[in-house]
Amino acid sequence: MGNSPSTQDPSHSTKKEHGHHFHDAFNKDRQGSITSQLFNNRKSTHKRRASHTSEHNGAIPPRMQLLASHDPSTDCDGRMSSDTTIDKGPSHLFKKDYSLSSAADVNDTTLANLTLSDDHDVGAPEEQVKSPSFLSPGPSMATVKRTKSDLDDLSTLNYTMVDETTENERNDKPHHERHRSSIIALKKNLLESSATASPSPTRSSSVHSASLPALTKTDSIDIPVRQPYSKKPSIHAYQYQYLNNDETFSENSQMDKEGNSDSVDAEAGVLQSEDMVLNQSLLQNALKKDMQRLSRVNSSNSMYTAERISHANNNGNIENNTRNKGNAGGSNDDFTAPISATAKMMMKLYGDKTLMERDLNKHHNKTKKAQNKKIRSVSNSRRSSFASLHSLQSRKSILTNGLNLQPLHPLHPIINDNESQYSAPQHREISHHSNSMSSMSSISSTNSTENTLVVLKWKDDGTVAATTEVFIVSTDIASALKEQRELTLDENASLDSEKQLNPRIRMVYDDVHKEWFVPDLFLPAGIYRLQFSINGILTHSNFLPTATDSEGNFVNWFEVLPGYHTIEPFRNEADIDSQVEPTLDEELPKRPELKRFPSSSRKSSYYSAKGVERPSTPFSDYRGLSRSSSINMRDSFVRLKASSLDLMAEVKPERLVYSNEIPNLFNIGDGSTISVKGDSDDVHPQEPPSFTHRVVDCNQDDLFATLQQGGNIDAETAEAVFLSRYPVPDLPIYLNSSYLNRILNQSNQNSESHERDEGAINHIIPHVNLNHLLTSSIRDEIISVACTTRYEGKFITQVVYAPCYYKTQKSQISN
C-alpha cells in the first residue's frame, strides 16, 4: 500500500492550473492520515474529483470543493436525468426537490435516501462504481487557505427571487443581487409546493421545473423585513415617544394596520386604573403596546385636525387658529378620541394637561370665577407661585396625535381642586409647600379670619429708653408669620443663617403708657415660646408665664385659644390675689357681656362643639408648665370648663363652714368625747391624771415631783420606779441585736481612746428595713412605732410612743 495515488488523470498531469499548490499541500497532508491507509480507492477518487472541479472552483478550499462537487442536475438517487444536461455553472448546495423518490434502490441508498455515488462515477469501471466512495472528513488539523473571493455580506442581500440566468449574466449582476444557492432552492421549493394543491411525494424535481412558469420579479417571494419602532427619549423621566422611523407609510401598510386594529378594543389597556404599578419598565411596555393599538385612531385624528385647521382659517379667528394648529385634538369639546386606561394613568403620573383641559373647558366661566375668588384670598407669599399658574394655563398643549406626551413641568398649586378629578398630583404638592412648624406650635390654618390679635408687652423695666433696641426672639411666632408676611423681620436676621432659627421681631415703644409692645400681631391657635432681647441680651419677663426649655433656660410662653378676637397674656400675682379672693361683703365679680359674632370653622374646639357664644375678652388659663396662677380667675374657669352646667351663670365662691367640735382622732383621753358647745352641767367630773391614772396626761415635772416625795427620793430612783410601773417597749429587731450592740460598744471605746477603727463602724442596715413602719406589742396601754430612713449616708430612726386604751375600752364594752 503506497502513499502515491493508484490512478491519475493524464489530461491534468502536465497542466499547472491556478491554485495547484493548494492541492499539492492538501494531498501531502492526506498521505499520513488513517483514512488513506484504510481506503486506497479514496485517493484516486479525490484526485479525480479535485481535477474535475478545478476548472470551475479555482482557488476554493478543498473542503468546499468536496461539497460543491455535487451536481444539482442529478436526481435524489444520484443518477443522471434524461431530460437534463450537465450544467457547467456553479453547483447548488441544496437539492431542488426534497421529496422522497420510490425509484431509488434500497441497497444503494441510506436511511435519508441519499446515495454514496456521484456523477463522476458514470462511465467508470464497474468495480470502481460498486465500491463506495466515502467523503473524507478533512485533515486532522485545522488549516486556513488563502482565497481571492470576497465573502458575501448577508445584511446587504435583497431577499427576492430572480430569474435563472446563465453564468455570464449572473456574474454581470451586482454583488447584492446575487443569491446563495441555498436561499434560491428553498424559495423555489416553496413556490413549487404552493403551485400544486396536492403535490406527489414521488415527483422529481425535473417535473416541477417543467410544469412551473417562468419566474419573474412580480412573482418573487419577498421576505418582509420588519422595521422596529425606534425609542426616542423625551424630556420626561421614564417616558418615551414611540414613533416609526419612516414618517410616511404606504397605502398597503396603512390598510393592514387598520384591518388589524379592528379586532382590538382601544379602551382595553394593558394596565387599568386600579392596577398596581410595579416598575417603570412595565409602564413603558404598556404604553408602547397602546401606541401600536391606537395607530388607526391617530390617523383618523390627524385627518380631523386638518379639517379643523382649514375651518379655523376660513373663519379668520386668529386665537382659535393658533390653538387648533398646535392642539386641535385636545382643545375640541365635541370630538373625543378614545384613550386607553394606561394612557390616562401615564398622563396623570407625568403631568399631562390634555385631559384636564378637556374638562376645564366645559366649565370655563365657572372655573374662572372660582380662581379669581381664591386668588384674592391668598397671602402675598403665594402670589408669585400663582403667577406661574396663569402662564401655565395660557400655554396650550401641542398634540401630534391622539396621545400627547408633554415635557414634565414643575407642579404648581391647582386652585380648582373640585373641578377636575385629575388634579390629585398637584394637590399632593400643596401639603409640602408650607414650612415646618415647631413641635410646640399647633398651627392648623393660615386664614387671616381665624387668627387672633395677640398683645405682647414688656413691662418689667419702665425705665428702658425709647432708643433701646427691644426685640422678641421666637421661632414659633416667626414660623407662623412666615407665610403671612404681615410683619417685617429684621434684615440682619434674614441674612444670618444662625439668626434665622431665632428670628427677631421688633417691638414699638408707646410714649403714653411708657411700655414696649408688638403692633398687629395676628397668630393662629397654638402654644408659643418667646424671649426678649434688650440691647442684645436675652431675658424673660416676669409678667408672662414662664417655663424652661430643653437647655434649662427660662422662656416665656403663652397660648392662643381659637375663637377670640384679642388676647393679652399677662401674669400678676398681686392682681390675682385681689381679684380671685374677694371678701364676703364685696359683690361677686360678674362676667362681661357676651358679644355675638360668626362662629369659627374649627370643629375640634370645645366651644364650637358646644355651640357656646364666645366673649370678646377671653378667660383663658395662662398657667404655664409650672402651674402658675392666672389673671383671669383660673380656678373658676377650670371648674366651668369641666362641668356640664350653664356656663352663663355667675361664679360663686365656696363658703367655708367652721365647727367647734374636736374630731375623735385628736381627742386624748379614755375615748370620751368632750364637746366645747356642751354646758358645764353635762360634763361629768373626772379624776385628775396621776401616777396611777392617766399617766400620759400628767405633766412630767408634776409627776416626778410626786414620785420624789418632796426630795426624799432622788431622780434615778424615781425613774426606776416609773420604768418598773410603765416599762418602755423593746427596740426594733435590727436595733436590739447583739451584733449592733457590739459594734456600737467598740465604736464608743475607740472614740474614748482616740483610736478610730474604720473597719469596726459597719452598722449598715439592710435596705429592706428602710422606710418600713415597725411596731411592738401593746404593753401597759402603750404602743411604740418606729421607722428608719437614710439621709446622706447616715441612718435616722424615729420612735414614737402613743397611749393605747385597748384594755380600758374592752372593759367598758364588757360592762
Curated annotation (Swiss-Prot):
Localization in the cell: Cytoplasm; Vacuole membrane
Q: Where is the composition biased (Basic residues)?
A: 363-376
Polar residues composition bias: residue spans: 1-11, 32-42
What cellular-component terms does GO give this entry?
Answer: cytoplasm; cytosol; fungal-type vacuole; nucleotide-activated protein kinase complex; nucleus; vacuolar membrane
Spell out the Low complexity composition-biased ranges.
Answer: 313-326, 377-389, 599-608
Question: Describe its PTM?
Answer: Phosphorylated by SNF1 in vitro.
| Keyword annotations from UniProtKB, A to Z | Cytoplasm, Lipoprotein, Membrane, Myristate, Phosphoprotein, Vacuole
Chain spans, region Association with SNF1 kinase complex (ASC) domain:
724-804
Q: Gene3D superfamilies under this entry?
A: 6.20.250.60, Immunoglobulins
| SUPFAM superfamilies the record matches | AMPKBI-like, E set domains
**Alphabetized CDD domains for the sequence:** E_set_AMPKbeta_like_N (cd02859)
Q: Where is the lipid attached (N-myristoyl glycine)?
A: 2
Entry GO MF terms = enzyme-substrate adaptor activity; protein kinase binding
Q: Where is the composition biased (Basic and acidic residues)?
A: 12-31, 72-88, 117-129, 587-596
Q: Where is this region: Kinase-interacting sequence (KIS)?
A: 473-716
Record's keyword annotation contains Phosphoprotein: yes
Predominant location of this chain?
cytoplasm
Family according to the record: Belongs to the 5'-AMP-activated protein kinase beta subunit family.
Instruction: Provide the function of this protein.
Output: Beta subunit of the SNF1 kinase complex, which is required for transcriptional, metabolic, and developmental adaptations in response to glucose limitation. Has a structural role, mediating heterotrimer formation, and a regulatory role, defining carbon source-regulated subcellular location and substrate specificity of the SNF1 kinase complex. Promotes the PKA-regulated relocalization of the SNF1 kinase complex to the vacuolar membrane in response to various types of carbon stress.
| Protein known as | SNF1 protein kinase subunit beta-1
Q: Which gene encodes it?
A: SIP1
